From Swiss-Prot:
<keyword id="KW-0150">Chloroplast</keyword>
<keyword id="KW-0934">Plastid</keyword>
<dbReference type="GO" id="GO:0009507">
    <property type="term" value="C:chloroplast"/>
</dbReference>
<keyword id="KW-0687">Ribonucleoprotein</keyword>
<comment type="similarity">
    <text>Belongs to the universal ribosomal protein uS15 family.</text>
</comment>
<dbReference type="Pfam" id="PF00312">
    <property type="entry name" value="Ribosomal_S15"/>
</dbReference>
<comment type="subunit">
    <text>Part of the 30S ribosomal subunit.</text>
</comment>
<dbReference type="InterPro" id="IPR000589">
    <property type="entry name" value="Ribosomal_uS15"/>
</dbReference>
<dbReference type="GO" id="GO:0006412">
    <property type="term" value="P:translation"/>
</dbReference>
<dbReference type="GO" id="GO:0005840">
    <property type="term" value="C:ribosome"/>
</dbReference>
<dbReference type="InterPro" id="IPR005290">
    <property type="entry name" value="Ribosomal_uS15_bac-type"/>
</dbReference>
<dbReference type="GO" id="GO:0003735">
    <property type="term" value="F:structural constituent of ribosome"/>
</dbReference>
<dbReference type="GO" id="GO:1990904">
    <property type="term" value="C:ribonucleoprotein complex"/>
</dbReference>
<keyword id="KW-0689">Ribosomal protein</keyword>
<dbReference type="InterPro" id="IPR009068">
    <property type="entry name" value="uS15_NS1_RNA-bd_sf"/>
</dbReference>
<protein>
    <recommendedName>
        <fullName>Small ribosomal subunit protein uS15c</fullName>
    </recommendedName>
</protein>
Length: 78
């Protein structure tokens, strides 16, 4: 459901958060197998920061869209 509606506007905050979430999950599973891959761990931390900043922006601008997005993507709220 999220994919279909987000492919229309790749610049939207929701699509960017969705994309970062997929990359984060993929990197997290990679790091479970390769615990000493520190460059990937650094990349994961960068992605987490970018996603966190986008979510903070969305929460400030439109709380309803923010709540809907974190529930769809199963992300914890800070």
């Amino acid at each position: 459901m999220v994919k279909e509606e987000k492919q229309e506007n790749r610049g939207s905050v929701e699509f960017q958060v969705f994309s970062f979430t997929n990359k984060i999950r993929r990197l997290a599973s990679h790091l479970e197998l390769h615990k000493k891959d520190f460059s990937s761990e650094r990349g994961l931390r960068r992605l987490l920061g970018k996603r966190q900043r986008l979510l903070a922006y969305l929460a400030k601008k439109n709380r309803v869209r923010y709540k809907k997005l974190i529930s769809q993507l199963d992300i914890r709220e800070k």
